[in-house]
Regions:
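Formylglycine-dependent sulfatase
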Residues: 2-13, 20-447, 453-456, 467-487, ...
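Short hydrophobic beta-strand that contains or immediately precedes a catalytic carboxylate
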Residues: 460-461
Length: 514
């Protein structure tokens, strides 16, 4: 019998595992793994949340989007309602995803660009791909990476950056920084969705002039079919697919497919921005049609990969994940991410594994650093989880809902900003602007002054009774709640050796367990 494993998490991503033939000697077969993670895909932007069997388990209205493939996928899967992106920003989340470490240890505390040498994925730690490679896997990466400090290493223009923008954001990742990926079709970050580019394994640039998720899905299908003998068919494979949309821009048909836009183009904005905390009068509101069109396009691209897996008999295990959400006119902010609001932090996570994982909903508050060890655990590689990993392996809970596993009490929130600059204007440190904690009931975020390190702003929401986070509660009137959240936050900050713990920031509020 085939065993299929599929996981969908935040922003949106796909991780797939499938079984291989058992080697001689009767040893357990190694599963194939595919992990797809679209950028800036929020948990609320999935149609099935409004359908029977799902809507009863969440206290929010889903966005009015069309995601038919994800709808079907979710009904065969374990779906998390409360997966969290702890530092809801592209590079920091990806650093945590790859290393299983929080941003202060992964090497990626800030979004990567050429002005931030302080932010680049560490070369001296084993990433999830290093572990899979060491276990005998062929490893392939497709699409957006955005974890490297850009340097002037353009393969086609030696001594120059791969883009002329200042600071440079896009980056070429040389072979020695690919962490076990032996097949490469990737770029750093570039936001022209119908004019993407990629560097292949040998550093050759490709400019396909095609909407990037559909192009990447096609390349994944080609890899699955082993066109050109790009992988060893006797080996299991680990694939990561970093789709950029529905990440901004979302302003015109240059950013999405017209057939998807047509589903939304005639809808009044107040019928699209239906969350009570959304403001359809904001200038950004027109973006909703294009954002939702990109969501539908990503769903279609995901479907192409699923169809190929089924066609080839490789649909046995699959997981889906993302990096952060999108506020989209909620909370009266133009910033789509990097905030403790549920639209930004709460991401999709879905797992399908017939015969192994029971289709169900679960409120496990999975954090970004937990993904790497959990994926390794699901692939039977728990014994190979690196000692550097700070996240927790929750694979036993996926495989058995009654497993004796200590669940997290909540998820840490992290916001870092640029710190000190050197004489050349390069960022040499980062400012830990905010830390917070989200439990099943409340969200707390504390913001400090850059110089004094004193509290300057707080957010406290009763998420159970105020799911759209419209009523910021005063700290002094909710002391018992704040004390409890700060106690939980202090434990995690100490455990991960966060700058707030090292500097004892707000120690009058946060007990660090001295």
């Amino acid at each position: 019998m085939k065993n299929r494993l599929n996981i969908l998490l935040g922003g949106l991503g796909l991780f797939a595992l499938q079984g291989c033939k058992a080697p001689q000697g009767g040893q357990a077969r190694q599963p194939n793994v595919i992990y797809v993670f679209p950028d800036q895909y929020r948990n609320q932007a999935m149609e099935f949340w409004g359908q029977e069997g799902f809507r009863e388990r969440v206290n929010f209205r889903n966005d009015p989007v069309h995601t038919p493939r994800l709808n079907d996928f979710a009904r065969e899967s374990m779906v998390l309602t409360s997966a969290m992106s702890n530092c809801p920003l592209s590079s920091p989340h990806r650093g945590s995803l790859l290393t299983g470490m929080y941003p202060n240890k992964s090497g990626v505390p800030l979004n990567c660009n050429s002005n931030r040498p302080i932010s680049s994925l560490r070369a001296d730690v084993d990433c999830v791909s290093d572990v899979f490679s060491g276990a005998g896997y062929d490893c392939a990466y497709f699409g957006k990476l955005h974890t490297d400090f850009p340097t002037p290493n353009d393969p086609q223009r030696p001594g120059k950056y791969v883009e002329d923008r200042i600071p440079a954001w896009d980056a070429y990742t040389p072979k020695e920084r690919r962490h076990g990926f032996n097949y490469w079709y990737s770029y750093g970050t570039f936001d022209e969705h119908k004019n993407p580019h990629y560097w292949d394994t040998d550093g050759k640039r490709h400019d396909p002039h095609e909407w990037s998720p559909l192009h990447e899905a096609g390349k994944v299908v080609s890899y699955l079919r082993n066109e050109g003998n790009v992988r060893d068919p006797k080996k299991p494979f680990f694939i990561m697919v970093g789709m950029n949309p529905p990440h901004s821009p979302y302003r015109s048909l240059d950013d999405c497919m017209e057939q998807d836009f047509n589903l939304y183009k005639d809808r009044p904005l107040d019928s699209l921005l239906i969350r009570p905390n959304a403001d359809p009068e904001m200038a950004k509101a027109e973006s909703a049609r294009y954002y939702f069109a990109s969501v539908t396009g990503v769903d279609r691209a995901f479907g192409q990969i699923l169809d190929a897996l089924e066609e080839l008999g490789l649909d046995e295990n699959t997981i889906i994940v993302s990096d952060h959400g999108e506020t989209m006119c909620s909370q009266h902010t133009d910033d789509p991410k990097n905030s403790p609001f549920s639209e930004s932090m709460n991401v999709p996570f879905i797992v399908r594994f017939p015969g192994k994982i029971k289709p169900r909903l679960d409120d496990l508050m999975l954090s970004s650093p937990d993904i790497m060890p959990t994926l390794l655990g699901l692939a039977g590689l728990s014994g190979s989880i690196p000692a550097t990993v700070q996240g927790h392996n929750y694979a036993p809970l996926f495989l058995d809902e009654k497993a004796d596993v200590v669940r997290p009490t909540g998820a840490l929130y992290i916001q870092n900003l640029d710190g000190e600059k050197d004489a050349d204007g390069k960022i040499r440190s980062y400012f830990p602007a905010s830390r917070g904690f989200k439990s099943a009931h409340y969200t707390l975020a504390l913001y400090i002054d850059r110089d004094s390190r004193k509290l300057v702003k707080s957010l406290l929401f009763d998420d159970r009774n105020d799911p759209y986070q419209m009523n910021n509660l005063p700290l002094e009137e909710n002391k018992d709640v704040v004390d409890g959240l700060c106690a939980e936050m202090g434990k995690v900050l100490k455990e991960i050796d966060d700058p707030w713990y090292r500097e004892r920031i707000l120690s009058d509020m946060i007990p660090y367990g001295e």
